[in-house]
């Protein structure tokens, strides 16, 4: 697996959860002898929704909601077989979306 790179993208709504998951991945990769770059924070997406409170009149009465999507990127340079096996067995939190890419 020489001259390869694993890129891991993490997405979550809770920044504490994504930081904890990123730290678990970094610890696992370093324990197996791989070199890690990151976690690199990417820009946070903020989606805002405005909802009318009143069912009939009062156009001024509105509620605003927001959901933030936090993202992180990790690069694992020169992974070993142990690194790949350990990452496959790693159990991360349920609220974190993980995308793994081999380059």
Swiss-Prot record:
GO terms for cellular component: ribonucleoprotein complex; ribosome. Keywords: Ribonucleoprotein, Ribosomal protein. It comes from the Bacteria. GO terms for molecular function: structural constituent of ribosome; tRNA binding. InterPro entries: Ribosomal_uS10, Ribosomal_uS10_CS, Ribosomal_uS10_dom, Ribosomal_uS10_dom_sf. GO terms for biological process: translation. Belongs to the universal ribosomal protein uS10 family. HAMAP family: Ribosomal_uS10 (MF_00508). Involved in the binding of tRNA to the ribosomes. Part of the 30S ribosomal subunit. This is Small ribosomal subunit protein uS10. It comes from Chromohalobacter salexigens (strain ATCC BAA-138 / DSM 3043 / CIP 106854 / NCIMB 13768 / 1H11).
């Amino acid at each position: 697996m020489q001259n390869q790179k694993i890129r891991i993208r993490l997405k979550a709504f809770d920044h504490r959860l994504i930081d904890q998951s990123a730290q678990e991945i970094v610890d696992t990769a370093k324990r197996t002898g791989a070199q890690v770059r990151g976690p690199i924070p990417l820009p946070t997406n903020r989606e805002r929704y405005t909802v009318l409170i009143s069912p009939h009149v009062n156009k001024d009465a509105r509620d605003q909601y927001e959901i933030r999507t936090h993202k992180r990127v990790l690069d694992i340079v020169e992974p070993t077989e142990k690194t790949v096996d350990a990452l496959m067995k790693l159990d991360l939190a349920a609220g974190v979306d993980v995308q793994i890419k081999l380059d």
